[in-house]
Amino acid sequence: MRFILCKYKRIITKKGDEAGVFDFFYLILQADELPFSHYFTHSNNAARLLFKDINTIKIMGKKIQFSLVYRDMWQSSGKFQPRKDQLVRIAPVFVEMGCFARVETNGGAFEQVCLLAGENPNEAVRAYCKPLHEAGIKTHMLDRGLNALRMYPVPDDVRQLMYKVKHAQGTDITRIFDGLNDVRNIIPSIKWAKEAGMTAQTALCITNSPIHTLEYYTKIADELIAAGADEICLKDMAGIGQPALLGKLTKAIKDKHPDIIIEYHGHSGPGLSMASILEVCNNGADIIDTAIEPLSWGKVHPDIISVLSMLKNEGFDVPEINMNAYMKARALTQEFIDEWLGYFINPSNKIMSSLLLGCGLPGGMMGSMMADLGGIRQTINNLRKKKGEDELTMDDMLVKLFSEVEYVWPRVGYPPLVTPFSQYTKNIALMNLLTMEQGKGRFVMMDESMWGMILGKSGKVPGAIDPELVELAKKQGREFTDADPHTLLTNALDDFRKEMDENGWEYGQDDEELFELAMHPEQYRNYRSGQAKKNFLADLQAAKDAKLGAKVSPEEAAAFKHAKADAIVSPVKGQIFWEFQGDGEALKATEPFIGKEYKEGDTFCYICTPWGEFETIPAALGGQLVEINAKQGTKVNKGDVIAYIQRPEA
């Protein structure tokens, strides 16, 4: 504890039609990291006479901290996350910037996409967190509660292991949220996270509906705090939270729970985020999530420079930014985009849109939604042409979809539009557009995941299910449930231990490899077999080809692609054999994957001549395979190009 003498200039009051701005001195008894409601003031007589209630005074000067949500920046922009080597390069630059108390390092949409890229997420998290820890920066992860790090429910024993593993790897804070705001899906995680030594930050998924009121959110916050939550995050995942409500919610939580740290997470898509940040800070928020260029703004997050400038000029105590380090982090992020991550980024995610306010869909899913909409549009227009009706443009379809989401959302119980329930709600609306065009009506094409949300298998939706859907469920023999979702699952770790033992796989440090298999079984198996890396490199090459092909002719694209590559030419006529058996037991022989590395003089392939001899074809000067022109078993003539290998950089 310490006393600090402070002078605040912007003390604003309003009483009737009279307003005043006063300067005064006061002492505050400051306890480190406590919110303002813990400070006791001793103002001058004029101020004390004017204000009987300190809450009527707008106090400027509260300390605000910032988190860099680097993981979510990438998730909201595209498909993949930076590799371990890239994260290790940029982490010290975040430290050098000097303005971040926290960095979001991992969690949902990090570990899984690492595996999809053929990378080990455990190694990445450990290496990434280390320099941040050494500098005193706290690390945090995204945690989907019942679904943990994936899109469907996870057994209790796997969820418990997750917190032990992630804390051992260097993650300090877990941000636990549930897409339905069902506290039953969050409360067990609070206990397990704290037992593992982590800070349990629980999230309120913010949206706008007649159900999602101030009272609704404060009740959930009370329940989570009573269950042991250390912090509260206002997770404004679509950026549609109204600033006034967010300010009132922040104040309501702080008034009742002054020790609780409040962190605000918003997206910039609909354009409300800066106003929301100002409101929550003026009402007691402690930490604000921010981004950096070139991935800030659009449908992602506000940039730290703008947020810090706004709050500083409002009178808050904020850190300075080392702009040289900011520009270094900006350049490195752009380098990562240019190297490969940009091929999986949808350009539309850089565009803000007020249309998001109407439907409430999160910005991060707009890219995939537009792709889905394009496919449905073609089918709908074929139907309309047969009926002699005008075709619909993409803009027409977008307005129709947003209107249908507004129709569907209340009827399925107002689930907060966040993963995975935003996808389910959007898909119901999309299928409705198609079936209505076919003359079949609504709610005809719904899969098990959509019904699971409606029936309560993932938790309780906030609102009432429409009677039409209740009746439809009865007709189809479906049953509603109010059971606690996590009690419907059986423990699974023993089965995964058995699988690892049978394969001769190590459990890994702190059982981290066992955890990855249990959390992402299919992706982990593909990672271990090498298939994930093959698939990823093929997808990357296809994305590069598509981007290049959109700008130039096929001939120009080929010339550009082959500029740094050596053509592997057949010296004889014959049949191509890339290999004589597959890469693994019982796998058929096939051509290699795009991206495979060769050293100078390595055997590249074989050609069986018409006279029965096998000609060994070397890999020229070596490098990376970028194109295959002859499949396994095809016939080639002398002089035909078999493939291209890109030479390594000098």
Locations of regions flagged by a protein language model:
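Positively charged N-terminal leader segments that act as targeting/secretion signals
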Residues: 11-49
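Hydrophobic faces of well-ordered beta-strands that scaffold small-molecule active sites
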Residues: 65-70, 101-105, 137-144, 174-175, ...
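Conserved, mostly hydrophobic/aromatic
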Residues: 73, 176, 232, 284, ...
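Terminal or standalone catalytic/regulatory effector modules within metabolic enzymes
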Residues: 95-113, 348-356, 360-566
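Active-site beta->alpha loop and helix N-cap motifs at the rims of alpha/beta catalytic domains
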Residues: 107-220
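Catalytic cores of alpha/beta
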Residues: 216-220, 271-283
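Glycine-rich phosphate-binding active-site loops on the catalytic face of alpha/beta enzymes
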Residues: 236, 285-300
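Acidic, low-complexity mobile loops and tails
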Residues: 552-606, 613-618, 622, 627
